[in-house]
């Protein structure tokens, strides 16, 4: 039902543009993203952000005289499924570009598809360093988020400030993102606070139905603080199970989660069950600041109107920024040829509702603050 509704929104957005307003066929953007399962809580808002950007751009005449058409597909947060639907989008639907995926299992796999087909692929959220490290980067992959090295450094810097913390544990999903994030954190923490001992590391799978064994195992090691990379439905399930067991109270709420759970999405899902006093980040931290840029206010108002939600998602902005970046690349290249667009995007700066961003020439990332 959710997928049908999102596809309907995309069609409705396209219908708002008068017929005959464009000189040529649409620029097709394939959008593999989780629209079902525990990660849909993020996947759906990311897609909605992209759809909003496309709607606004089309209302202003499109790009190079052509409208944008987003073709969403449910990747199910699974690498094989993300590859399958991406190839189908390229071969069957003839998409010009790929934008999407959510996890660091999907994105590296789709990056390979993009390389094989010489098609630009923008990953809105995948953070694993493997996506853009020197051994794996290719000319067609770009990322509008930061990476796990930055994430781990930030978490370690904050953790190191707690002078009374002597023992630390980690809990992260058992795949590239979680492993990379925890490793980066531990590496930096050892530099900053060599006196701290890592007493436990737990590795639940994505979509873990019951976190109780991991929670009780970690509590038995009596850490003073915890670093986590749990996200989406996993963080929601974990929090609901951990709080009654006294998990957060046992560590005096010294819990840092680097997986963007400091958002309205989790607050809405958990309500009063949201764990008090924890520290986390957000793809759209401007939501919580007093000095909100005018452009961001406009974006939030437009997003609420588009989604008919009372509270704007903290994840939609990365989908929105991905389309903005792609469109600027197309305009700079004055072409939809991926080789030309990819070259145009190297070192390119682009405007977003939270300020300018720029793709690194070396790593194709924006290192966006969160």
Where does each model-flagged region fall?
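Extracellular/periplasmic periplasmic-binding protein-like sensory domains
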Residues: 242-320, 331-332
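Signal peptide-proximal N-terminal region
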Residues: 24, 47-70, 190-196
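Beta-alpha junction/loop-to-helix N-cap segments that form part of ligand/metal-binding clefts
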Residues: 41-48, 62-133, 144, 203-211, ...
């Amino acid at each position: 039902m959710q997928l049908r509704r999102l596809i309907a929104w995309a069609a409705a957005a396209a219908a708002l543009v008068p017929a005959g307003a464009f000189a040529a066929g649409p620029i097709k953007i394939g959008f593999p993203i989780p629209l079902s399962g525990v990660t849909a809580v993020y996947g759906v808002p990311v897609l909605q952000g992209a759809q909003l950007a496309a709607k606004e751009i089309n209302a202003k005449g499109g790009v190079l005289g052509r409208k944008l058409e987003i073709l969403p597909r449910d990747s199910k947060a699974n690498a094989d499924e993300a590859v399958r639907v991406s190839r189908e989008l390229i071969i069957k639907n003839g998409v010009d570009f790929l934008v999407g995926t959510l996890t660091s299992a999907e994105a590296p796999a789709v990056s390979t598809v993009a390389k094989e087909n010489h098609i630009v692929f923008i990953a809105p959220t995948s953070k694993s360093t493997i996506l853009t490290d020197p051994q794996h980067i290719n000319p067609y992959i770009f990322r509008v988020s930061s990476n796990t090295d930055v994430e781990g450094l930030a978490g370690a810097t904050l953790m190191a400030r707690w002078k009374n913390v002597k023992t630390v544990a980690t809990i992260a999903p058992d795949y590239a993102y979680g492993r990379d994030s925890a490793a980066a954190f531990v590496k930096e923490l050892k530099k900053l606070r060599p006196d701290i001992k890592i007493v436990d590391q737990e590795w639940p799978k994505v979509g873990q139905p019951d976190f109780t064994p991991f929670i009780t195992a970690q509590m038995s090691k009596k850490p003073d603080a915890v670093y986590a990379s749990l996200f989406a439905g996993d963080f929601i399930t974990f929090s609901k199970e951990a709080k009654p067991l006294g998990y957060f109270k046992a560590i005096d709420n010294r819990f840092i989660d680097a997986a963007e759970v400091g958002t309205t999405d989790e607050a809405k899902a958990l309500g009063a069950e949201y764990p008090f006093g924890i520290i986390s980040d957000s793809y759209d931290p401007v939501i919580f600041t007093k000095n909100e840029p005018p452009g961001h206010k406009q974006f939030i108002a437009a997003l609420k109107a588009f989604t008919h939600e009372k509270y704007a998602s903290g994840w939609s902005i990365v989908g929105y920024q991905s389309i903005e970046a792609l469109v600027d690349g197309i305009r700079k290249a004055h072409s939809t040829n991926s080789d030309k667009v990819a070259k145009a995007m190297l070192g390119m700066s682009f405007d977003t509702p939270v300020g300018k961003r720029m793709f690194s020439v070396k790593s194709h990332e924006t290192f966006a603050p969160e």
